[in-house]
Amino acid sequence: MNEAVKTLDGWFCLHDFRSIDWAAWRELNPANQELMLNELSHFLSDMEITKNIGEGEHTIYSILGQKADLVFFTLRDSLEALNEVENRFNKLAIADYLLPTYSYISVVELSNYLASHMAGGEDPYQNKGVRARLYPALPPKKHICFYPMSKKRDGADNWYMLPMDERQKLIRDHGLIGRSYAGKVQQIIGGSIGFDDYEWGVTLFSDDALEFKRIVTEMRFDEASARYAEFGSFFIGNLLPSENLSKLFTM
C-alpha cells in the first residue's frame, strides 16, 4: 500500500454561503429591520472579541452571481466552537432572511510534503512559519475566491497510487507557482477528506481579482492540476466590512 500523506492541522473552517431573501426583507418595517441589524452587529462584536484574543478568525464577503449573496468565513480551534458560532448565527432574527445556499467544512492543513521542509527538523507546531499557516490571520483584501477540489482516482491518473516521492515532487513544483504570487495572493488550504464532498477547500485573497484568474490558469497547466485535479464550483466576492452591513440591507 502506498504511504498516506500526514498533515499538520490548525483551525477548523466553515464557509457559510447565504442568499438574501429580498422580497421578505422588504415586507419588514424599518424599525424591525433596525432591530435585526443591531442584533447582528452585537453578534459580530462578540466575534471580534474572539479574534482579538487569538481564539479564531472571521470575515464577510459579498458574493457575485446567483450562487449566493454573502459568505461568512469562520475559523475556530474545534468543531464544537465552530458549531456554536453556526448555531448562534442561525438563532439571530435576521437569519430567517439569509437563506443557506452552500457550505463547506474543512480544517486548515499543511501536508508533510511541505511541513518538514518549513519546520527544519524542529517541532512544527512550535515553528512560527508553520503556525502562521495553520492559524492564519485573515487579510482584509478586497476580493475572495473559494473553490473545492479533489485529486483524481481515474485509471492511470490516480493520485493515490503514485509513490510518495513522486507526489512530493509534483506538490513541490506546484507550490513554486503559488510562491511566485507571494504578496499578490494569500492562500488558505482546508483539508476536508472525511469532512465534506471534496478533499480540499481553497480560499484565495487578493486586492486584484485578476490575480485569481492568473494563478488558477497557471496552475491548470502544471501536471499536479492538469492531470490529477478535479474542481467544484468557484465563488468570488468583494470584502464587506461589518460596518457596511447596514448599508447593504438599507432599502
UniProtKB/Swiss-Prot annotation:
Instruction: Quote the catalytic activity from the record.
Output: Fe-coproporphyrin III + 2 H2O2 + 2 H(+) = heme b + 2 CO2 + 4 H2O; Fe-coproporphyrin III + H2O2 + H(+) = harderoheme III + CO2 + 2 H2O; harderoheme III + H2O2 + H(+) = heme b + CO2 + 2 H2O
Q: How is the cofactor bound?
A: Fe-coproporphyrin III acts both as a substrate and a redox cofactor.
Q: Quote the Gene3D superfamilies the UniProt record gives.
A: Apc35880, domain 1
Give the Enzyme Commission number.
1.3.98.5
Residues noted as binding Fe-coproporphyrin III in the record, renumbered to the chain: 133, 147-151, 174, 187, 225
Record bears the keyword Metal-binding: yes
Among Pfam families, the record links this protein to: Chlor_dismutase
Cofactor(s), by name: Fe-coproporphyrin III
Task: Output the superkingdom of the source species.
Answer: Bacteria
Would the keyword Metal-binding turn up in this protein's UniProt record?
yes
Q: Name one GO molecular function term.
A: peroxidase activity
Identify the InterPro entries for this entry: CHDC, ChdC/CLD, Dimeric_a/b-barrel
What does the protein in this record do? Involved in coproporphyrin-dependent heme b biosynthesis. Catalyzes the decarboxylation of Fe-coproporphyrin III (coproheme) to heme b (protoheme IX), the last step of the pathway. The reaction occurs in a stepwise manner with a three-propionate intermediate.
Q: What is this protein called?
A: Coproheme decarboxylase
Q: What gene does the UniProt entry assign to this protein?
A: chdC
